[in-house]
Amino acid sequence: MKKQKAKYEEALQCPVAYEVALNNVSMRNALVKSGVPFVNLPGNVFLPFMGIVLQDVYRKQLVKADKMMPATQMVFLELLYMSDEESVLKSEVANKLNLTKTSITRATAQLEEMGLIQQMKSGTEIAIKRNYSRKEYYENAKGYLINPVQKVITIMRYEATFESFSAGETALSQESELNPPRIEERAIYKGEEVVDQLEIVDARSEDPDDCLKIQLWKYNPSYFAREGRVDPVSLACTFKGNEDERIEMSIEELLEGTRDRLF
């Protein structure tokens, strides 16, 4: 392309640029690295001879507003549970939830695309704020929420020397009239180092009293856990797709209590 560009410029006696269809970020980066001017409307423009640099629209294209990413749900929950109705610095949320700059940027972009938050300048930083009261914020987000459970494993109870939180039917039974399950259920983050060291067993071959079911979560439940239990909104999400009438009634009871406390 550089040789062709030189021929065109010699023939036309002026700088030239290519109109391209960028299929991915790598293609765009390769053109920039090679110094080849290009235009890919509406947002990617690289005309160095005019002092114009491209505007990256890939972030918005890659952020879909159908279901929350794990990091997005973390930011959503942080804004839901915080007592302050005012805005909060995006950097503060990222630090509190241990999110990278890329993760917090994509998470807030997705929440903004869903119409749940707004972003605004605050000095030299960016602040974020809910677009609704806490109740409306939750109601408008329900369709986007994901099940945080990546996988469920069973281990022997004596292995549970790590921090974990009451989850699943165990936690639900503590918040409703549901009877507790035969095997206790608890949750940890799937990225914890201890996960690779756990020995998975077949509960059918063991005494249920000696076993624990461990939910491996896509985000760290410790950030929102209270009184040793996973947070109520995340707990309800772990039962997505469960059509057991007992569970459905207990979740409604759980959420009613949550609404009374939060809203």
Each PLM stretch: what is its role?
Residues 98-113:
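Short amphipathic alpha-helical interaction segments
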Residues 49-77:
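Short alpha-helical segments that sit at the start of domains
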